[in-house]
Each structure stands twice: as structure tokens, then as C-alpha cells.
Amino acid sequence: MISLIKKTLSGLSKTRTKLSNLFAKFSGKSILDDSDIEELEETLLGADIGWELTESILEKMREPDKKEVSREERFQQCIQQYLSDVDQPRDLHKVILLVGINGTGKTTSVAKLGGYFSNAGESVSLVAADTYRAAAVEQIRIWATRLNLHLTANDKSADPASVAFDGVSNGITKNLDRIIVDTSGRVHTSANLMKELEKIYRVISKLTDEVDVLITIDANTGQNALQQAREFSQYIPLTGVILTKMDGTARGGIAIQIMKELNLPVYFMGVGEQVDDLVPFSLDSYIKSLILMETEAVNG
């Protein structure tokens, strides 16, 4: 558990530093003045906390400081209450299809996800259905070899749906625990590419109804992430999110908006380049990591 919290802390360090420094500045003040509230509002919105939750937090922060409930605790309580009705991650299905726009770290996430399940003792197959990029197929092949995972790739086929069908079919025949399918990055405004993705999902669904569709979202994209997910969901039923590049952003609050506005659970956060830098998402660890310093979060 401590390892999970530390990984989450690492991924949210930039966001946490800004918020923690601000709350430290407020320490000792019984009441925050208008300039304090304005600075807090700017910081929360800059972290992509979202306007609705920011308003709720500001309302709580305007109340006089109480020794029995610190401002930090009230901050956490606001987020917990705000997210009390959102779906939480469940056990993922056998087949996991990863989708997303270009540059979100999707192919790397496929490999990391494979490593995660393999480390848990599960048999895993990677399916290289990003047929538009030879480099992506080679990247998956290298990862599969390095992690000792099964692989389905077809250098001669340009039809991603065909590769996906073969990969999932082979994995089911071999009774593997997980089959993780990579797809090419696509602009969510391109109807033709999105319909192709729809076809990939359709052919996989003919083989099994145990399919999860996770969208990889670059945490740095902020509000654009919401629009990306909405567009993808028009063509394919998204069941969850992998937030990538969390270690490089000060906008870690975007996870809150994704969960609340899209009602999609966040399953993993990418917090680095190594294969084990894909962290299972824990709402409790996430909320603690937004504001508390490392020793407090680990010991709290």
C-alpha cells in the first residue's frame, strides 16, 4: 500500500507542490481574506480541478479555521463528497482494447499493462493492431520479448480489425488470462478513423462479451481530455481511463473532472517511463496526494 501511495505521490508532485505551498501559506490564519481566496481559486482552476468543485472548496475555505477539522481535511472532504456517486474501478475483463489520440502514450501503456498483469502471475498476450505505424508494431514486439509475453502481429496485414480478431481469437483459444489490444492513434474528429475503431470493437465483440475499452489520456491536455473522451464514446463504449504523463503535469486535477463529468473510472496512472510506472488508481491515495506532503500521506 505504501508503494502505491509513493507512486501516486510521485505522479502528482507538481500539482501537490502548488497546493501544499498555498495551504502552508494559509496556516495560522483564522480567516482567509479576498486575496487568499482569489489565489486559491486561480491555483485550483490551474490544476484542472474544475469550476463546480472549485466553488465548493472556496465556500468551505471561507469558513473560519477550526482546530478539529483543518483546511486540508476540509479540502479532502469536498473532493470525496463531490465524487461520492461516480463509478469506481472494478476487475477488468479478459480483453482490454486501448484507444486514444496520437501522442497519449497508448502503445507504451499497452506494454506497461501487460507487465502489470504478468507481474501479478497472469498469462498475457499483446496484440499489435496499430497497423499504420511499423514502429508501433516493432515497439510492441520488443516489449513482448522483454516481458516474455505472447504476441500477435502481422507485418503483411494493413487491416487492424483483422489483426485484432486474430489476436483475440488466439488468446481465447490458448485460454490466456489477458489479451491487450493496441490500436493506432487517431484524431477524434476524423469520422472514417473512428468508424474503423468501431469495426475493431465489433469484430472483437463477436468473439467475447468480456471486453473493456480504456482510453489513454495525456494529463497535460486538461479540458481537451473531456472532449476527446466524449467524441470516442460516440463510436465505441468506453469503460475506463488510463491517465498518462501524470508525472510531468501540474494539472493533476483533471482526473476529478473525468470521473465526475464522464462517469468513467480511472484505472491506472502513468507516472514515469519504466514498465512498472503504471499505477493502479486509488481514489483515497489520489486525494491525499493532491495536497499532503509525502511523509504525511504515507503515515496518515
Describe the residue ranges of each PLM region:
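Primarily NTPase-proximal linker/entry elements flanking Walker-type ATP/GTP-binding cores
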Residues: 10, 14-131, 136-181
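A generic structural signal for ordered alpha-helices
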Residues: 1, 18, 32, 178, ...
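Conserved catalytic-core segment of NTP-binding enzymes
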Residues: 160-174, 188-292, 297
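Short beta-strand segments
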Residues: 99-100, 182, 216, 270
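Short glycine-rich anion-binding loops that position phosphate/pyrophosphate groups of nucleotides
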Residues: 184-186
